[in-house]
């Protein structure tokens, strides 16, 4: 990350959010602070991805902010393209997964159905296959941080705050280490705030029950 950033911009800061890990993430990250422009934020417990993202965003100060997962599957070569689109006037440039052939058919079906439900019942367009990997202007970050929601569905909020957006298709690289712990349970837990906050489905269900 440091090498890519130095090639593209004159000044930057890296913020690592340790979302209540039990391994050596915090210790090893802190050890790098003397060598790199790095800050490490350690949460008191595992709050989940959405809250970890917001905790990091609230501590940024730059004119532009990039969100990047720690699994290193998203090629940093796309940062240059994102910056070019920002120079064209786009205030948020986000990555979209080009294909999902490495996933099971059940997970692909669940994801497709989930986004279909979201977009049928929502006034805000929520792109399917969009990643959290994105470059955002300071105004976008400030707008997200000003929202009062505690249980957040970030992919919905990215679209809800508005601004000019641009999608960039990417191919994911293999995970650098380990295996993903984000399975169906994580998808379901993440999806509930999305369905309840960004669609009319809960109202329709309760209306149907009342009838």
Question: What residue ranges belong to the model's regions?
Answer:
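Short beta-strand/loop segment that forms part of the nucleotide-sugar
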Residues: 2, 10-21, 41-43
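Short helix-capping segments at alpha-helix termini
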Residues: 5-10, 33-37
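A conserved acidic beta->alpha catalytic loop
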Residues: 18-27, 72-73
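Acceptor/aglycone-binding surface of glycosyltransferases and processive sugar-polymer synthases
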Residues: 41-45, 49-59, 76-157, 173-192
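Catalytic metal- and UDP-sugar-binding loop of GT-A-like glycosyltransferases, i.e.
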Residues: 43, 68-70
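Short aromatic/hydrophobic "clamp" motif used to bind/position activated sugar donors
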Residues: 65
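Alpha-helical bilayer-embedded segments of polytopic membrane proteins, i.e.
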Residues: 192-211
